[in-house]
Amino acid sequence: PAAAGPRDGRAGAKAEVDRLYGEAEAATERYNAARENTRRLRAEVDRAQDRAARAQEGVNRMRDTLGSMAGAQYRSGAIDPSVQLLLSSDPDSYLERAAFLDREGERRAALLRKLRGAARTIARTRAEAGHALAGLERDREAVARHKRTVEDKLARARRLLASLPAEDRAALDHAASDAPSAPGAASPRATAALDAARRALGRPYVWGANGPTAFDCSGLTQWAYAQAGVSLPRTSQEQRHAGRVVPLSQARPGDLVAYRADASHIAMYAGNGQVIHAPHPGAPVRYDPVGMLPVSSVTRV
């Protein structure tokens, strides 16, 4: 068979670089999701520990009250058997005999019930904190794992690009740079988000970044909509569900365009068949044709 020519070699290199960037983007979105979950779990742990601390303060106050009641009886010359049970290690037996106590004893019984309820709350809250901490550790490991995957894919892509002649590298990284003349956006907030994305043109791609000086793909769209007062989820997979899905043929400026079956890349439609997006490391925020990758969905926020 005939030897592959330079064009075939460049096409093969482009396919391999595209594959590596695609895999790196998928890993980046998994990294973003794991990092967001880590933040959520950290907040859960903090809230659980705060609830446990407040409950413990209540327990301490009730124990002080019970101790004062026992001390008063001791100074009066006798300790009621009910108090002995109250301060024993088996409060359930006290509750079983609470019906035999006098009114003062009933007050102590009610206090003991509160004490036992607070103790259960502390145990439950500490268990919740322990569960959240275990999840936090798992997600920290996932963050580190996805980070290693991204770095490996990007390093391989950089090595492949570095091995190509300069003109081939330029051809692989060619992108549209002229702003399209767009029809009207779907809403004022979409207009504001698109304006923000345009202000980000030329800023660098940094995986895991969400502005204002650098972005990954979902970080750009999240930041742009935040400038319009709209809170979007962090990952491209979540963002594709952040509004109403419309056909690509009906895309309006400001719509989110998700790519590949796993929605591992996302861009903002800018009109006239163009999108603004953060492509990959080494390529700044820029315009590209909407069909640069297989489109999986278009979402109107």
Describe each model-derived feature in a short phrase.
Residues 64, 68, 74-80, 85, ...:
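Amphipathic heptad-repeat alpha-helical coiled-coil "stalk/arm" segments that mediate oligomerization
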Residues 180-301:
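Peptidoglycan cell-wall recognition and remodeling modules
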Residues 2-71, 92-95, 99-204, 301:
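Intrinsically disordered, low-complexity
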Residues 51-53, 82-89, 157-164, 231-233, ...:
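Short, exposed beta-strand "edge-strand" segments with a Pro/Gly-rich flavor and a Y/T-containing core
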Residues 75, 103-104, 230, 284:
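Residue-level marker of structural boundaries
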Residues 61, 80-82, 89, 96, ...:
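Extracytoplasmic
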